[in-house]
């Protein structure tokens, strides 16, 4: 398959069921390589479940997900996954530098020695996200925004082709926000594929070129223009886009934190 024209992520008839209750129902879509995509939908829509089921972190009841035409186990080294902050044990005795160096494991292996070159590369990436001064700090001692940037740095260390990021913009202030946006734009300019679970519909048009709109089933997958219509938003959220944008602007503070 030509990597320049590949489908980076395809999902076919994916279903996930918890305790006899449908969480995701018959999800089918494909995402072209090089896209900058937002996964959006109301709370409980199955956004995080979609990522986890596609990566095999939770079991799907049916269907399949392929990355660059292959199962995840065959191409795991090409994929970087950034989990939600809430799922991380921030008390774990690990420094920021240690966390970033974990990004090497996909292409070096767990048991191979970390080299001086690896450490220098990790420090360059920490400088890129503004955390070089915190390299030796325990990860739980960072602010919310710094923690997000540390995990972003780990993802960058993986040198992946596809980045799957769960609530990347959660708990960051505006300075961190702009830094993260700049990094994403750099990745896109390098031909990388980026997928972000996102909550703020007011800036989807500015940040992304592709949308995956969910509410347990697939409402729309396509360009921002195709998916951010009144009809699609009403189908997913139960209200019109203008009202939803206004509501999200009022509540946006809960998604912002310290740097």
UniProtKB/Swiss-Prot annotation:
Subcellular location: Cell inner membrane
Topological relation to the membrane, as annotated: Peripheral membrane protein
Every ABC transporter domain range: 9-241
GO molecular function: ATP binding; ATP hydrolysis activity; ATPase-coupled transmembrane transporter activity
GO CC annotations on file: ATP-binding cassette (ABC) transporter complex
Cystine pairs: none
Matching Pfam families: ABC_tran
Keyword terms: ATP-binding, Cell inner membrane, Cell membrane, Membrane, Nucleotide-binding, Transport
SMART domains documented for this protein: AAA
Domain of life of the native organism: Bacteria
Binding site for ATP: 41-48
Principal subcellular localisation of the protein: membrane
Family: Belongs to the ABC transporter superfamily.
Biological role stated in the UniProt entry: Part of an ATP-driven transport system CT_067/CT_068/CT_069/CT_070 for a metal. Probably responsible for energy coupling to the transport system.
PANTHER family for this protein: IRON TRANSPORT SYSTEM ATP-BINDING PROTEIN HI_0361-RELATED, METAL TRANSPORT SYSTEM ATP-BINDING PROTEIN TM_0124-RELATED
Protein name (database record): Probable metal transport system ATP-binding protein CT_068
UniProt organism field: Chlamydia trachomatis serovar D (strain ATCC VR-885 / DSM 19411 / UW-3/Cx)
Classification lineage: Bacteria, Pseudomonadati, Chlamydiota, Chlamydiia, Chlamydiales
């Amino acid at each position: 398959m030509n990597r320049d024209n590949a489908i980076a992520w395809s999902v076919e008839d994916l279903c996930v069921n918890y305790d006899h209750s449908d969480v995701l129902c018959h999800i089918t879509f494909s995402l072209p390589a090089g896209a900058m995509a937002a996964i959006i939908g109301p709370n409980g829509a199955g956004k995080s479940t979609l990522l986890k089921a596609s990566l095999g972190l939770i079991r799907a009841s049916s269907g399949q997900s392929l990355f660059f035409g292959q199962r995840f186990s065959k191409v795991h080294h090409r994929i970087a996954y950034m989990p939600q902050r809430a799922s991380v044990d921030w008390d774990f005795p690990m420094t920021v530098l240690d966390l970033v160096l974990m990004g090497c494991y996909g292409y070096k292996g767990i048991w191979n020695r970390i080299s001086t070159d690896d450490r220098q590369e990790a420090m360059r990436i920490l400088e890129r996200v503004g955390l070089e001064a915190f390299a030796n700090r325990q990860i739980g001692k960072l602010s919310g925004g710094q923690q997000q940037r540390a995990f972003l740095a780990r993802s960058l260390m993986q040198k992946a082709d596809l980045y799957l990021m769960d609530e990347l913009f959660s708990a960051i202030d505006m300075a961190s926000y702009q830094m993260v946006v700049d990094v994403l734009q750099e990745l896109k300019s390098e031909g990388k594929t980026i997928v972000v679970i996102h909550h703020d519909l007011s800036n989807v048009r500015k940040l992304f070129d592709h949308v995956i709109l969910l509410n347990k089933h697939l409402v729309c997958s396509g360009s921002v223009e195709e998916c951010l219509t009144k009809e699609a938003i009403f189908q997913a959220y139960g209200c019109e886009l203008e009202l939803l944008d206004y509501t999200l602007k009022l509540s946006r503070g809960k998604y912002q934190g310290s740097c």
